């Protein structure tokens, strides 16, 4: 985890205006305009309450706080809209879940779920689908419903090619807010069959052949839509991405050589495999901090754009918070409670 120049906090969950708090200033994201500055004030961060408190002797205090109604500076509401913020009362990892939920919600911009809104300007179907699983649990699907229903492309083309796992991810997204009668469903299934051999999706995902992973997504999404499947089948071959698909382990052999070494570049991959294997998590990876999630050296991220938040982040090709990482952590911690 790379530390920025100074502690920051992002305000503007869901479809609210985005604001950056850092260096005792509140900056509006869209035009980089400093709205408030509190030089000489002491600051206190309460990450799991989405709150920053500034105080100065003789001047009283200023409270920046975001809740289910809006984002407030004391009694002034800077952005208002309804979102659901569960307290996760009674959960072992209550504070972590609240922070992770925030890191997902804050990366919904203009109704679109993106991995990190500084370095990615459009959604990825995979990250969006994982975010959708979280939003379903927290009753916040209304935040991305319009985006899902507006989709027309079968692939997101974010890696400059048509990646087969996108098809199942798109179908799953549709299942969250619509049903099998959605006009895109038939097109997706026909495309999946077109690129399949013996019921197994073919093609390149993340630069490699991940046939099992892509087919897993398709079967999972059809089940979510209530569509009977007698065509797509899990292939009998090795695919290291298969162990990331914890949503349905059927037909996938557990691997005996799982590398426990943490993936500091793409931690969501490590978390997904941990979830699949039902492995315990080292408590050092669950410390209360902010942000809790990140990605480093991703090929399609525009890291220069995150200088607005941190020069150190930009120089190190680092973005935080990150929604796929956040979703994998959140969903495993939720399952661990069961």
Q: What are the residue ranges of the model-derived segments?
A:
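Low-complexity, Ser/Thr/Pro/Gly-enriched N-terminal "stalk/linker" regions
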Residues: 1-123
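Alpha-helical support elements that line or immediately flank enzyme active sites
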Residues: 120-142, 170-178, 221-222, 244-255, ...
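Aromatic-rich carbohydrate-recognition surfaces in CAZymes
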Residues: 87, 122-234
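Polar/charged alpha-helical tracts
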Residues: 18, 54, 62-65, 183-186, ...
């Amino acid at each position: 985890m790379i530390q920025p120049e100074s502690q920051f906090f992002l305000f503007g969950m869901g479809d609210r205006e985005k604001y950056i708090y850092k260096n005792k200033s509140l900056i509006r994201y869209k035009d980089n305009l400093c709205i408030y500055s509190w030089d000489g004030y002491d600051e206190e961060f309460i990450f799991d309450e989405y709150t920053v408190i500034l105080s100065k002797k003789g001047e009283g205090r200023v409270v920046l706080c975001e809740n289910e109604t809006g984002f407030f500076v004391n009694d002034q509401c800077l952005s208002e809209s309804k979102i659901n913020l569960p307290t996760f009362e009674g959960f072992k990892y209550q504070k972590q879940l609240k922070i992770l939920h925030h890191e997902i919600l804050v990366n919904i911009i203009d109704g679109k779920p993106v991995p990190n809104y500084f370095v990615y300007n459009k959604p990825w179907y995979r990250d969006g689908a994982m975010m959708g699983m979280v939003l379903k649990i927290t009753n916040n699907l209304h935040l991305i419903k319009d985006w899902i229903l507006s989709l027309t492309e079968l692939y997101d083309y974010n890696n400059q090619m048509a990646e087969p796992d996108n098809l199942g991810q798109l179908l799953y997204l549709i299942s969250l807010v619509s049903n099998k009668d959605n006009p895109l469903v038939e097109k997706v299934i026909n495309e999946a069959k077109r690129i399949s051999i013996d019921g197994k999706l073919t093609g390149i995902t993340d630069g490699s052949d991940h046939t099992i992973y892509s087919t897993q997504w398709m079967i999972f999404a059809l089940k979510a839509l209530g569509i009977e499947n007698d065509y797509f089948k899990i292939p009998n071959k090795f695919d290291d991405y298969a162990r990331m698909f914890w949503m349905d382990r059927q037909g996938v052999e557990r691997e005996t050589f799982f590398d426990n070494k943490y993936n500091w570049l793409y931690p969501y991959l490590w978390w997904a495999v941990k979830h699949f294997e039902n492995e315990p998590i080292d408590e050092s990876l669950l410390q209360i901090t902010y942000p809790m999630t990140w990605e480093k050296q991703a090929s399609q991220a525009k890291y220069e754009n995150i200088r607005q938040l941190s020069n150190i982040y930009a120089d190190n090709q680092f973005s935080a918070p990150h929604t796929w990482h956040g979703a994998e952590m959140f969903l495993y911690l939720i399952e661990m409670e069961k």
